[in-house]
């Protein structure tokens, strides 16, 4: 007697729109209710943002012209979000929550992108485990809406890892280098080391598959994108933030 073999059930896959909504709820709650955990966030980022938008604020030695170890680019990007919100609701509280909600939304978009790549490249069950962790993890809850360069680097690292996993249409080496480079240039420089294991794998696969030429081209393409980002960041700091600070200081 012949028995008809049934195919195994497909793994459960949460649609991307539901995933985005779940991440938005979690990160939105963090933006509205999570306390600020680090004094560095207050004095090195919220105070300079207040300075750019309102003309006064406290200054740490790290932003002092004597030392200048921090770039104003990261702060100015978020100050622009707060300034745009002030045109809708003229309130400093509204600016504060607009920036935090913007951070939460950005994190949710990056989480959804990485979840999608994990489900397609690995397995939907692994993607579901990842989603469960990022939604209910206390660390991710606080980091998702934190106004810190390491948070920005976390966003770009998720996008870089998503590009590394997503091999549809071929490897996205240049895109991966660009995302990690953006995180290192604008966010936290030491995070650039995160790309080293990924590049090692790309090098091994490239030489084993006897396609070193395309790999070298992709690496040079990614390096050129990072160079363009670095030049753009310097020009933005020189021609936008620089004159603003000069007028504010009264030089």
Identify the residue ranges that each predicted region occupies:
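Transmembrane-helix signature of polytopic, membrane-embedded enzymes
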Residues: 12-18, 90-98, 102-137
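Membrane-interface alpha helices of multi-pass inner-membrane proteins
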Residues: 28-31, 130-144, 158-189
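Hydrophobic transmembrane alpha-helices
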Residues: 78, 82-86, 112-119, 138-141, ...
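Start-transfer (signal-anchor) and selected internal transmembrane alpha helices
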Residues: 1-30, 225
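Short acidic/glycine- and proline-prone juxtamembrane loop motifs at membrane-interface regions
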Residues: 38-40, 142-152
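Transmembrane-lumen/periplasm boundary regions of multi-pass, lipid-linked membrane glycan transferases
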Residues: 150, 180-251
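Hydrophobic core segments of transmembrane alpha-helices in multi-pass, intramembrane catalytic enzymes
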Residues: 51, 107, 111, 134, ...
């Amino acid at each position: 007697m012949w028995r008809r073999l049934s195919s195994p059930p497909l793994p459960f896959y949460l649609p991307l729109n539901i995933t985005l909504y779940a991440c938005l709820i979690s990160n939105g709650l963090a933006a509205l209710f999570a306390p600020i955990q680090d004094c560095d966030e207050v004095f090195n980022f919220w105070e300079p943002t207040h300075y750019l938008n309102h003309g006064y604020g406290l200054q740490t030695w790290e932003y002092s012209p004597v030392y200048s170890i921090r770039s104003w680019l990261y702060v100015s990007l978020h100050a622009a979000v707060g300034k745009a919100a002030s045109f809708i609701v003229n309130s400093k509280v509204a600016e504060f929550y607009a920036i935090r909600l913007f951070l939460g939304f950005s994190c949710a978009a990056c989480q959804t992108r990485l979840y999608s790549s994990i489900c397609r490249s690995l397995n939907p069950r692994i993607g579901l485990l990842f989603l469960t962790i990022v939604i209910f993890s206390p660390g991710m809850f606080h980091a998702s809406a934190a106004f810190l360069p390491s948070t920005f680097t976390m966003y770009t690292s998720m996008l870089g890892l998503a590009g590394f996993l997503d091999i549809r249409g071929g490897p996205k080496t240049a895109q991966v280098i660009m995302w990690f480079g953006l995180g290192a240039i604008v966010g936290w420089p030491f995070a650039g080391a995160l790309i080293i294991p990924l590049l090692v794998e790309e090098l091994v696969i490239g030489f084993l598959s006897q396609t070193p030429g395309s790999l070298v081209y992709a690496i040079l393409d990614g390096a050129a994108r990072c160079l363009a980002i670095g030049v753009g960041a310097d020009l933005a700091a020189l021609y936008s933030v620089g004159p603003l600070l000069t007028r504010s200081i009264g030089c």
